[in-house]
């Protein structure tokens, strides 16, 4: 059996178990298991199938063992903001409602009207941008719809916290994900007790906040028996974007980062939060990062639009087009000029992404895309112009001029998007590594194991180990 570390990286559409090893200062990755993920409608809401996720995590651990690996450590990362509640017997309460559900509509306005909490005040306390699905709005929606669930709750765990708890039996809230609740103080980096009390939420359900690198414990005897080995459960940056930022092989302090996946998150790492009125107006966020740094970034709709178009075309024809086929179609319509605002809530969960893009173009008196290539080119135009605006705003807010954009994650494989991004922003684009999130997850484990002394050494190893493609503006 080969000793290794294991990253369980779960996204909105799929999850992977990726084994990592270090030899002669170089990192090797091997995917040992993959599974599908998604939402379904239950009790009137879009929900995650948490029971299936739990089983798939265990299935992947078995697969690693069956492939001849003996993980010494395991780390789990997922998306942010979503959570589960446990009762006094540690049983789950209610459903794990997904962030794309509509239950939070109107909640932000209700907080101001009923609790006197303006968004400007909220932002000044937490530094977290407005998104309709922020955990605080989900909790307040739950309080309105099912107050009995909050009353019965004894433990609040975000999705990766809960999966970690199932593996080792230790409840904890990890900092990078906890920060996305908009209930953590930007300066204190801890639960904002006054804010929680003001909103009438039960303070006792929130667990002590732990940082990435914390060892929670060993696999429970039941899990050990099921998977065939024991391992330490370590907290990575459990928010997938937090892990992805760790994997950015930035060369200097003038590099901006873009984690490109279902969501595009563009920003930089800061030592202190920026929570002034200009930052609030720009809706930039100060999410928790590794070693209590801040990921100062803009949340952009990202590849969700492309994924939705692809899925929709597959439903219409019976065969999903490949991403290269969609890129080729866009190139054929490269002169199509229209673009929309990817951050408009109309694109969050439309019945038809293609028709929503067309309607948005019509609403703004632009040419309406007809063929698939025109729709795709419109999406590419929209994303890259959003990236350009985000870079310009970032420079204004930080007072820095950035010279490069480092793209990690699945979107870094899209050479057409990378080149269009370089053209739109005027920045040199460095693309890769592709497995940014899983790699960042593993970095924390490698530092814990002593394979690397610190993050700087780990990032240098990433540059040695993976192909990084360069795109110059044209």
PLM features: what roles do these ranges have?
Residues 6-7, 19, 112-126, 137-158, ...:
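Active-site core segments that coordinate phosphate-bearing ligands/cofactors
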Residues 77-80, 212-213, 260-263, 404-412:
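Glycine-rich beta-strand-to-loop/alpha-helix junction loops that act as flexible
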Residues 70-78, 155, 208, 400-409:
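Short glycine-rich phosphate-binding loop at a beta-alpha junction
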Residues 11-13, 72, 77-79, 135, ...:
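Short, basic and Ser/Thr-rich N-terminal targeting/leader segments
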Residues 61-134:
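Active-site phosphate-binding/coordination module
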Residues 101, 173-178:
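Nucleotide/phosphate-binding loop and acidic/charged catalytic motifs
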Residues 34, 97-104, 262-264, 433-437:
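Short, acidic/turn-prone active-site loops that include or flank metal/cofactor-
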Residues 1-94, 152, 224-233, 425-427, ...:
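N-terminal glycine/serine-rich phosphate-binding loop of ATP-dependent small-molecule kinases
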């Amino acid at each position: 059996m080969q000793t290794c570390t294991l990253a369980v990286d779960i996204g909105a559409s799929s999850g992977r178990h990726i084994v990592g090893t270090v030899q002669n200062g170089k990192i090797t990755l091997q995917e040992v298991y993959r599974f599908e993920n998604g939402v379904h409608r239950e009790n009137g809401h879009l929900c995650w199938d948490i029971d299936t996720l739990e089983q798939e995590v265990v299935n992947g651990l078995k697969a690693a063992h069956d492939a001849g690996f003996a993980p010494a450590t395991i780390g789990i990362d997922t998306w942010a903001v979503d959570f589960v509640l446990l009762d006094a017997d540690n049983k789950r309460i209610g459903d794990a409602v997904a962030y794309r559900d509509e239950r939070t509509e109107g909640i932000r306005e209700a907080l101001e009207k009923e609790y006197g909490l303006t968004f400007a005040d909220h932002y000044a306390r937490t530094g977290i941008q407005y998104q309709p699905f922020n955990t605080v709005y989900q909790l307040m929606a739950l309080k309105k719809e099912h107050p009995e669930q909050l009353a019965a709750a004894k433990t609040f765990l975000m999705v990766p916290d809960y999966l970690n708890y199932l593996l080792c039996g230790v409840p904890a809230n990890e900092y990078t994900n906890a920060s996305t609740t908009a209930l953590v103080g930007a300066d204190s980096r801890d639960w904002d007790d006054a804010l929680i009390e003001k909103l009438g939420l039960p303070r006792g359900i929130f667990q002590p906040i732990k940082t990435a690198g914390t060892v929670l414990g060993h696999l429970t005897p039941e899990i050990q028996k099921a998977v065939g080995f024991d391992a330490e459960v370590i907290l990575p940056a459990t928010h997938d974007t937090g892990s992805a930022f760790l994997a950015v092989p930035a060369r200097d302090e003038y590099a901006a980062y873009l984690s490109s996946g279902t969501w595009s998150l563009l920003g930089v790492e800061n030592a202190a939060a920026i929570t002034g009125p200009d930052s609030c107006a720009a809706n930039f966020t100060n999410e928790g990062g590794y070693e209590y740094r801040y990921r100062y970034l803009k949340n952009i709709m990202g590849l969700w639009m492309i994924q939705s178009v692809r899925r929709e075309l597959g439903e219409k024809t019976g065969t999903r087009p490949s991403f290269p086929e969609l890129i080729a179609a866009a190139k054929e319509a490269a002169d199509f000029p229209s673009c929309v605002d990817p951050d408009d809530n109309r694109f969050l969960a439309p019945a038809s992404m293609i028709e929503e893009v067309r309607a948005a173009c019509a609403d703004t008196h632009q040419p309406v895309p007809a063929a698939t290539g025109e729709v795709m080119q419109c999406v590419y135009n929209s994303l890259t112009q959003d990236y350009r605006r985000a870079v310009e705003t970032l420079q204004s807010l930080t007072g820095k001029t950035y010279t490069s954009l480092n793209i990690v994650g699945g979107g870094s494989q899209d050479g057409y998007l990378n080149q269009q991004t370089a053209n739109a922003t005027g920045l040199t684009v460095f693309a890769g590594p592709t497995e940014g999130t899983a790699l960042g997850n593993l970095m924390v484990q490698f530092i814990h194991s002593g394979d690397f002394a610190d993050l700087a050494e780990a990032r240098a190893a990433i540059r040695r180990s993976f192909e990084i493609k360069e795109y110059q503006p044209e």
